[in-house]
């Protein structure tokens, strides 16, 4: 509790996996997602992360949120004047919108309807109610409210991978191999497990330049003069 935005959940999962630990991570966030059936946002995008060793150099890291789209992507779209995908947000009147500015004024939609709403609620309980942090819409938005700390709650659960089975490494390897051997739909060369694509992208791009849009470049240039 008494925390703020802690960055990427997957980073912490990677540290646990390096020590041969299975990990589950939950954190709540400022209001962005409306509970199923509500017109007002209350839950955050509330990331959920799971990590496990795989007996290979590529760990299994599932790092996702319960919303249809990351809130940061909506902010980027609003700043750059682009649209967001259909079916991810409602405006303040409860109507579907692809306008990022209207989406920020309205609500984001959870994944899988009422199921995603239930997951968001679960994360709010685990990381907010259980830890003693803010919950039920009380987490402050750092972009809009500077009156005090966010008091976000995080919950980290770690377990030894071989806690119940001494041959976990063999079993997880067999599990992944079984999934990867399934018949594939047309155009799919390999079935990837969570974290695999990220690993490949990182290796491909780790020595390349980072390209940013002209608008972001201008914003950074303006900040330089503000804080120098």
Segments (PLM) and residue ranges:
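A glycine-rich, acidic short-motif signal
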Residues: 1-58
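Predominant activation on well-ordered alpha-helical scaffold segments within soluble catalytic domains
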Residues: 14-17, 51, 87, 119-127, ...
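Short coil/turn connectors at secondary-structure junctions
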Residues: 18-22, 44-47, 55-59, 83-86, ...
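Glycine-rich phosphate/pyrophosphate-binding loops
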Residues: 20-35, 126-142
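Small-residue-enriched flexible segments
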Residues: 71-132, 149
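Catalytic-core signal marking the mid-to-C-terminal active-site face
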Residues: 130, 135-228
């Amino acid at each position: 509790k008494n925390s703020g935005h802690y960055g990427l959940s997957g980073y912490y999962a990677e540290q646990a996996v390096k020590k041969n630990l299975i990990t589950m991570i939950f954190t709540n966030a400022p209001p962005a997602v409306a509970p199923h059936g509500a017109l007002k946002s209350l839950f955050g995008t509330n990331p959920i992360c799971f990590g496990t060793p795989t007996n290979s150099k590529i760990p299994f890291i599932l790092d996702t949120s319960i919303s249809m789209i990351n809130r940061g992507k909506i902010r980027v779209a609003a700043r750059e004047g682009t649209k967001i995908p259909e079916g991810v947000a409602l405006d303040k009147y409860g109507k579907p919108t692809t306008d990022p500015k209207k989406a920020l004024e309205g609500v984001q939609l959870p994944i899988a309807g009422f199921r995603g709403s239930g997951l968001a609620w679960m994360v709010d309980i685990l990381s907010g109610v259980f830890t003693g942090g803010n919950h039920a819409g009380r987490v402050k938005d750092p972009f809009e409210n500077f009156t005090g700390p966010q008091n976000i709650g995080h919950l980290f659960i770690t377990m030894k991978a071989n806690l119940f089975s001494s041959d976990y490494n063999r079993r997880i390897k067999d599990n992944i191999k079984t999934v990867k051997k399934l018949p594939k739909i047309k155009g799919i060369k390999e079935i990837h497990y969570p974290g695999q694509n990220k690993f490949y992208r990182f290796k491909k791009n780790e020595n390349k330049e980072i390209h940013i849009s002209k608008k972001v470049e201008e914003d950074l240039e303006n900040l330089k003069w503000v804080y120098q």
